[in-house]
Swiss-Prot record:
Its cofactor is Mg(2+); Mn(2+). Belongs to the NAD-dependent DNA ligase family. LigA subfamily. NAD(+) binds at residues 42-46, 91-92, 125, 148, 184, 300, 324. This is DNA ligase.
Length: 719
């Protein structure tokens, strides 16, 4: 959508577009910042943010409370302790042309009211494509290392950071009592290639690029793994400091080097726009000769007092900007289209290319995104590439942007061979043969064989045993992978039922489990006890554990409350499939009954139908139900509940229960829960280490209580 198209939007269209953008950008923030698994290139992500900003500029009255313009990064993972940043760890605004940089400098001069004759000195440094890290030193000793997280709360990765040789454990020379040093953790290309070769030889996960490898390596639960990954660190700024120790950005860098940090040797200062742009082009030209990936240049006002005067906007400093490199392109022959099945069942087309070199990297595969993209249709149903589809045998234009997975952006129509036929996207999963369905409004086709599909199996079993599902202690990620890959059929776990037959089957094992490395008599006994304790679970947990698309904890509880027992639910789910096979009153009534439950609409109903229509899933379910019993759901009376009908938001860390447990409890007592604050919020329950929600709640006039008051409020209302 270009600027002219944005200007023609109605208020209703703009509101719908902003809602979609908020959700889409938030999803990609989590994929990039928390999961280290980006689906789109930096250029595509930047385009989404630009579109959001342009629509907000035209319709300021429609700016949402969850607008991406106000957010940084993504929420932290539950795997790590949280660490509150003493000074917010913001991201940078992006620029894409010399004109953008000129405007950036003009804005600074205007804000500071600088006369045209006054020189504005700027620093320039390569923008390292890695993971931002904040290092806190007290009395010269490293006491905390934290990732950016959402900009206010990060993940405490101190133990892992200590294994990186570039990060000093004790500072040298004279330094402030308290100093937070910000910088970038990265992996050199040669180390990245060696790591991937090692991963491949061991049959383990292969990283898409050095940035993902660095982020994944730093965020390991075992510091020994981080230590083995050869990570590096460049310092580029400071957060909180107890005393001033430099007058300029360049002096700060010099001091940090004296303290023992590595500073990028390409960092320089300039006095004119022409010098800055010349530096940008020089670095762009030689970027592939560097030992690490960069995706642009960062410019900063050199004078630290001017930085203080300029301050910040909602998610970035006024005194700095990232000048991004353009995407690199090349032509290639499309030799084939392969379909990969992801851990969530999504069928993703991948282009097989005749080898080409883009930016010094040999490319043989490229992303084709989804079924519509191949046909020449965009995410909103609009025509892309002037409606040209992509066919095997085409000469295609491949783009590599931000050092993420390359993608095909267009074809050379005149080079299409005669007889090239349109690509037919499969309707059956290539991994298990189950039906692959595409929901209305979705661009992705997904495998419905969730409980049987080998491509999804490990992730499905991990979900099945997770804390909010069957909650089986002793079956973590490593154990699930061990039992899935083991060659002995007497010990393998490929379906949920296999978990509950393991103890019986192991009698026929070639080697008993307690005699294997990593296990022992005590740990095996504990594992079997944990499994047997979960042979009876509440219906809501059972439904959630099945991993049916759109059936999260909330919808699982809704269905459990509506049907009370599994037999009643299964009867309706099976009956609702009947309209697919025959037209009948029973089927139609079952469909209406299912989809008229509050919060359960056609989209969720279709997901349930798809799941129960698949014979593979019914077979796996039947085997599971021979081993476990879903307990009937008890009605929860909410008439006397003090929070019935109220909208509640939870923030911070709760001591007596997890936030998920608190939300579930509130909903059982008749309240609605939300992840974001608005004027409709009745109550904010604040734990420790709260972020920005507290101030926002006070601004909106929302009542705020702590965890103790929350427990007193609901005392006697639940068992």
């Amino acid at each position: 959508m270009n600027k002219d198209e944005i200007k023609n939007l109605t208020a209703l269209e703009a509101e719908s577009e902003l809602e979609w953008l908020a959700k889409e950008i938030a999803r990609h923030d989590v994929l990039y910042n928390r999961d280290d698994q980006p689906e789109i290139s930096d250029a595509e992500y930047d385009a989404l943010r630009r579109r959001n900003a342009e629509i907000e500029a035209l319709f300021p009255e429609l700016i949402r409370s969850d607008s991406p313009s106000h957010k940084i990064g993504a929420p932290v993972s539950e795997k790590f302790e949280k660490s509150v940043h003493a000074q917010a760890m913001l991201s940078l605004d992006n620029a894409f042309s010399s004109e953008d940089i000129c405007e950036f400098i003009v804005r600074i001069r205007r804000f500071l009211r600088l006369p045209a004759t006054q020189i504005l000195e700027m620093t320039a440094e390569p923008k390292i494509d890695g993971l931002s890290l904040s290092l806190r030193y007290e009395k010269g000793r490293l006491v905390c290392a934290a990732t950016r997280g959402d900009g206010y709360i990060g993940e405490n990765v101190t133990a892992n950071a200590r294994t990186i040789s570039d990060i000093p454990k004790v500072l040298r020379g004279e330094f402030p009592d308290i100093i937070e040093v910000r910088g970038e953790v990265y992996m050199r290309r040669e180390n990245f290639q060696a790591l991937n070769m090692s991963q491949q030889e061991k049959g383990k996960f292969v990283f898409a690029n050095p940035r993902n490898a660095a982020a994944g390596s730093l965020r390991q639960l075992d510091p020994r793994i981080t230590a083995s990954r050869k990570l590096h660190f460049f310092a580029y700024a400071c957060g909180e400091v107890s005393e001033t120790f430099a007058a300029s950005q360049m002096e700060m860098m010099k001091k940090l080097k004296e303290y023992g940090f590595f500073i990028n040797p390409l960092t320089k200062s300039f006095k004119t726009l022409e010098e800055i742009i010349s530096y940008y082009h020089d670095i762009e030209e030689c970027r592939h000769s560097l030992s690490y990936d960069i995706d642009g240049i960062v410019y900063k006002v050199n004078d630290l007092k001017l930085q203080m005067r300029l301050g910040f906007v909602s998610r970035s400093p006024r005194w700095a900007v990232a000048h991004k490199f353009p995407a690199e392109k090349a032509m290639a022959l499309l030799e084939g289209i392969d379909i990969q099945v992801g851990r969530t069942g999504a069928l993703t087309p991948v282009a097989r290319l005749a080898p080409i070199t883009i930016g010094g990297v040999v490319v043989t595969n490229a992303s084709l995104h989804n079924e519509d993209y191949i046909k020449g249709i965009g995410h909103k149903g609009e025509s892309i590439r002037e409606g040209r589809d992509i066919r095997v045998g085409d000469t295609v234009i491949v783009q590599r942007a931000g050092d993420v997975i390359p993608q095909i952006v267009d074809i050379i129509a005149e080079k299409r061979p005669k007889g090239a036929s349109a690509f037919v996207f499969p309707h059956l999963c290539p991994a298990c043969g189950s039906h692959a369905v595409r929901e209305v409004g979705e661009s992705v086709r997904r495998c419905t064989g969730g409980l049987i599909c080998p491509a999804q199996a490990i992730e499905r079993i991990r979900h099945f045993v997770s804390r909010n599902a069957f909650d089986i202690e002793g079956l973590g990620k490593k154990q699930v992978e061990f039992f899935f890959h083991i060659q002995d059929e007497a010990l393998c776990i490929h379906t949920p039922a296999d978990i509950f037959t393991l103890q019986r089957r192991q009698e026929k094992a070639l080697v008993r489990l307690e005699n294997m490395e990593g296990f022992g008599t005590v740990s095996v006994r504990k594992l079997y006890n944990a499994i047997n304790m979960r042979r009876k679970v509440p219906l809501s947990r059972f439904l959630f554990a099945l991993g049916i698309r759109h059936i999260g904890e909330v919808n699982a509880r809704r269905l459990a409350h509506a049907y009370q027992n599994y037999t009643a639910f299964e009867t309706v789910a099976m009956a609702a499939t009947m309209p697919y096979d025959k037209v009948g009153e029973e089927g139609n009534e079952a469909w209406l009954e299912l989809t008229n439950i509050e919060g359960i609409g056609p989209q969720v109903g279709e997901a349930i139908i798809d799941f129960y229509q698949e014979a593979h899933n019914r077979e796996v379910l039947a085997a599971l139900l021979r081993e476990v019993t879903p307990l009937d759901e008890e009605n929860v009376m909410t008439a006397s509940s003090p929070i019935a009908g109220k909208t509640i938001v939870f923030t911070g860390t709760l001591a007596r229960m997890s936030r998920d447990e608190a939300k579930a409890l509130a909903e059982r007592l008749g309240a609605k829960t939300s992840g974001s604050l608005s004027k409709k919020t009745d109550l904010l329950v604040a734990g420790s280490a709260v972020g920005s929600k507290l101030a926002k709640a006070q601004g909106l006039g929302v009542e705020v209580i702590d965890e103790e008051a929350w427990l007193q409020l609901i005392e006697g209302s639940y068992i």
